């Protein structure tokens, strides 16, 4: 008893020691420091690459649903190309699937389409459906179309991604992105006494939809939406549009808008002014590398090298001609040349308008920069065309040649003008801008390569619109209703891939790994250890580096798996379709034979000569390729390129826990020694 009594502490001292130990334990429990990718449970950084095709599913808690955008596979994102991937169907109810995390989208869409009778084509969004929360550009399209169906589906079987909800149909007036849903198998969580519970995100909810990134809006007007031949117009203002007939980038539309605004090539009447693009103009400029990094523009849309030429004027039979007038023009790209021969030598401060019936010289007027030259004569000039042939900010030269317009319809802006009594053979109007010199313009475009990702000043939802005629001559048809990426996958394999995408060749050459998830989990994880002096900032950097590195490899691996699986499914679909056709023919043949009508082939003719193809070997080869890529040759392990820092830092989580336990034991012994 005496030996046992030596090991016992007084009651008051025991209480103090126990309280001190419990404080340490609770402190460790409350301030857990996750280092690595944290999802449903804390994962070590090195475990991420081994989750694909390496782990088995023990419970549904190990599944994490992720929305992957189709633009990551290289599909065309402009409105004309995107609308060709959507179609209407009836008799198929919509389906909605929730997902936990997604990628930031560079291009989102917002549709409001009406039928010819004025009724709505698209259904309103159900309760709980919110717009996609991370959009760099939102393409807002309005217009009319036949809408031959109840709902707008994706022809390739992809989903329309909303905020944490993916639907098979398009809802009216809600931002959405195209994508597919993938499921990740997470490692089974390890329950320990000192581990804090994982932070749960609110289901289908995003608190901050802006995420400190500017969202720019482009507006369009579409005619005959959903039909084989449609017209899409990019809207500059309510009466000025640009007809788009080729793939383009949002940056091109922004620069085109600024150029038209700067040159004052806007409709000065209540009628429409529709500009078309010359074939020599490159509309695929200024490609972005997703959100974080803006690539230098490989080519600038130089306004001083563009020519604006009015082509024709169409009027309806209505009494109010001004409200029904449609003026068409062409924006062309001209080679750099000298225009000294077009500048009047005796009047260097004038803009020359050459008119076949006469010429009158007017004195120059003082005006502000950026205003138009307005011709207000009442007589009709046969064959007149206004063409801006040069400008560098303050200098502009305009000449007119014949197309059958009245002088009041020319896009110029001089409120008053009087003809000179000296001659009746020529007319020269005074502009509010001096004549362009023969020197090369030095004013850079407004969107310089070094500009930031903020939206341009003219890109608000009110003054940016997008309207376009988009009928592609070489448009590819869909390959079937397959619930996967399909066309995007074909593009990622090289058939339709856009070469200007930045690709991390270290991870893979078949997809774009420059992606980032917009989960609320990351902010909590990164901030969980920032309070520690000296150690906090470094640990946050470790977390971010590990997250970005492993996420890229994981997403690329998923895309490769989807690519090869989809091709096999396409072949299987084709084989099934042909087998069904062959079965129907046999049924018809039996029917005809029973009626003794002379045999199947005699009655069916060429339709009898259908032979179903055997695609078994092709499907088997694709499956073997998947096994070879993801089982025999798994994704690269991060240990292959570990250096001294990435090697010893893996001991940090364990070291922190061991150090805390040692400190607690030492403190307990010290307290016991002092109290004893």
From Swiss-Prot:
Stretches the record annotates as Mucin-like region: 305-485
Region (Disordered): 312-351, 406-458
GO biological process: clathrin-dependent endocytosis of virus by host cell; entry receptor-mediated virion attachment to host cell; fusion of virus membrane with host endosome membrane; symbiont-mediated suppression of host innate immune response; symbiont-mediated-mediated suppression of host tetherin activity
Residue ranges annotated as Cytoplasmic topological domain: 672-676
Lipid-bearing positions (S-palmitoyl cysteine): 670, 672
Polar residues compositional bias, start-end: 415-430, 448-458
Signal peptide positions (record): 1-32
Residues with site note (Involved in receptor recognition and/or post-binding events): 57, 63, 88, 170
Residue ranges, annotated region (Receptor-binding): 54-201
Taxonomic superkingdom: Viruses
Sequence ranges on the Extracellular membrane side: 33-650
Transmembrane segments: 651-671
Skewed-composition ranges (Basic and acidic residues): 330-344
Any one GO cellular component localisation term in the record: host cell plasma membrane
Residues in coiled coil: 554-595, 615-634
Fusion peptide: annotated segments: 524-539
Positions bearing carbohydrate: 40, 204, 208, 238, 257, 268, 296, 314, 366, 463, 563, 618
Post-translational modification (record): The signal peptide region modulates GP's high mannose glycosylation, thereby determining the efficiency of the interactions with DC-SIGN(R).
UniProt family annotation: Belongs to the filoviruses glycoprotein family.
Free-text comment about domains: The mucin-like region seems to be involved in the cytotoxic function. This region is also involved in binding to human CLEC10A. The coiled coil regions play a role in oligomerization and fusion activity.
Additional detail: Filoviruses entry requires functional lipid rafts at the host cell surface.
Protein's recorded name: Envelope glycoprotein
């Amino acid at each position: 008893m005496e030996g046992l009594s030596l090991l016992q502490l007084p009651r008051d001292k025991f209480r103090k020691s126990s309280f001190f130990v419990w404080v340490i334990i609770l402190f460790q429990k409350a301030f857990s420091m996750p280092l690595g990718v944290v999802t449903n449970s804390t994962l070590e950084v090195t475990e991420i690459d081994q989750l694909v095709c390496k782990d088995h599913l023990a419970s549904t808690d190990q599944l994490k649903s992720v929305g992957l955008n189709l633009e990551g596979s290289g599909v065309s994102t402009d409105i004309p190309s995107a609308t060709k991937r959507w179609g209407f169907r009836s008799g198929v109810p919509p389906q909605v699937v929730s997902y936990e995390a997604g990628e930031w989208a560079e291009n989102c869409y917002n549709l409001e389409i009406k039928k010819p009778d004025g009724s709505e084509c698209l259904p309103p969004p159900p309760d709980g459906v919110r717009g996609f929360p991370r959009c760099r550009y939102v393409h807002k399209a309005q217009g009319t179309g036949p809408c031959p169906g109840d709902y707008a589906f994706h022809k390739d079987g992809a989903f329309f991604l909303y905020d944490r909800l993916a639907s098979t149909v398009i809802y009216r007036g809600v931002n959405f992105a195209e994508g597919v849903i993938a499921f990740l198998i997470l490692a089974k969580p390890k329950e320990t006494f000192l581990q804090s519970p994982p932070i749960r995100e609110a289901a289908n909810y995003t608190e901050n939809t802006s995420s400190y990134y500017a969202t720019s809006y482009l507006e369009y007007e579409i005619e005959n939406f959903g039909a084989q031949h449609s017209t899409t117009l990019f809207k500059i203002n309510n009466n000025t549009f640009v007809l788009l007939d080729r793939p383009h980038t949002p940056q091109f539309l922004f620069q085109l808008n600024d150029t038209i605004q700067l040159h004052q090539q806007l409709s000065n009447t209540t009628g429409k002014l529709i500009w078309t693009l010359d074939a020599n103009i490159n509309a695929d400029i200024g490609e972005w590398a997703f959100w974080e990094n803006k690539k230098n523009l490989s080519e600038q849309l130089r306004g001083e090298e563009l020519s604006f030429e009015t082509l024709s004027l169409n009027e309806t039979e209505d009494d109010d001609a001004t409200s029904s007038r449609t003026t068409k023009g062409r924006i062309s790209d001209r080679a750099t040349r000298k225009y000294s021969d077009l500048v009047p030598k005796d009047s260097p401060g004038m803009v020359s308008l050459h008119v076949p019936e006469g010429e009158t010289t007017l004195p120059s007027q003082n005006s502000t920069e950026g205003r138009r030259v307005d011709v207000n004569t009442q007589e009709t000039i046969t064959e007149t065309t206004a063409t801006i042939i040069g400008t560098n900010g303050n200098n502009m030269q305009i000449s007119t040649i014949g197309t059958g317009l009245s002088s009041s319809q020319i896009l110029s802006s001089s409120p008053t003008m009087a003809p000179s009594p000296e001659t009746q053979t020529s007319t020269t109007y005074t502009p509010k801008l001096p004549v362009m010199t023969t020197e090369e313009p030095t004013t850079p475009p407004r969107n310089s390569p070094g500009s930031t990702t903020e939206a341009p000043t003219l890109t608000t939802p009110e003054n940016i619109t997008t309207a376009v005629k988009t009928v592609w001559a070489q448009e590819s048809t869909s390959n079937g209703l397959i619930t996967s990426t399909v066309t995007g996958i074909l593009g990622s394999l090289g058939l339709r891939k856009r070469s200007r995408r930045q690709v991390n060749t270290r991870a893979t050459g078949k997809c774009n790994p420059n992606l980032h998830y917009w989960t609320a989990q990351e902010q909590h994880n990164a901030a969980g250890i920032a309070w520690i002096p000296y150690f906090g900032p470094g640990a946050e950097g470790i977390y971010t580096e590990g997250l970005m590195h492993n996420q890229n490899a994981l997403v690329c691996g998923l895309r490769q798996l989807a690519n090869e699986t989809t091709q096999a499914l396409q072949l299987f679909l084709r084989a099934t379709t042909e087998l069904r056709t062959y079965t129907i023919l046999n049924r018809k043949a039996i029917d005809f034979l029973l009626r003794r009508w002379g045999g199947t082939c005699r009655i069916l003719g060429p339709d009898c000569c259908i032979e179903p193809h055997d695609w078994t070997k092709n499907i088997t080869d694709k499956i073997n390729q998947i096994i070879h890529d993801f089982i025999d040759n798994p994704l690269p392990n991060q240990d292959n390129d570990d250096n001294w820092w990435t090697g010893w830092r893996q001991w940090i989580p364990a070291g922190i826990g061991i150090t805390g336990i040692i400190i607690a034991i030492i403190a307990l012994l010290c307290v016991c020694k002092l109290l004893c």
